[in-house]
């Protein structure tokens, strides 16, 4: 079985669906993201971007979550479409 091609969440485009694969960073950061529903196996899509492009809003677990690109770069995803 081959490893999936992973991208950072910051690279996800509006028309793409993805599954969260792994999260890097400190324990505190991982805990904070997990408390917001950012966990391995969750489906995530881009909802919209701010006028300057950062932060971006994502659809996850039936709600919209805003994340800075600085945080999104620590979240690795596998494209689903």
How should these model regions be labeled?
Residues 1-81:
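Compact, glycine-rich, soluble single-domain proteins
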């Amino acid at each position: 079985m081959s490893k999936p091609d992973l991208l950072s969440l910051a690279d996800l485009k509006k028309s793409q669906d993805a599954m969260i694969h792994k999260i890097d960073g400190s324990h505190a950061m991982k805990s904070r993201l997990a408390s917001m529903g950012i966990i391995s196996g969750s489906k995530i899509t881009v909802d919209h971007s701010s006028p300057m492009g950062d932060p971006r809003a994502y659809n996850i677990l039936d709600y919209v979550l805003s994340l800075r690109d600085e945080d999104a770069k620590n979240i690795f995803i596998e494209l689903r479409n």
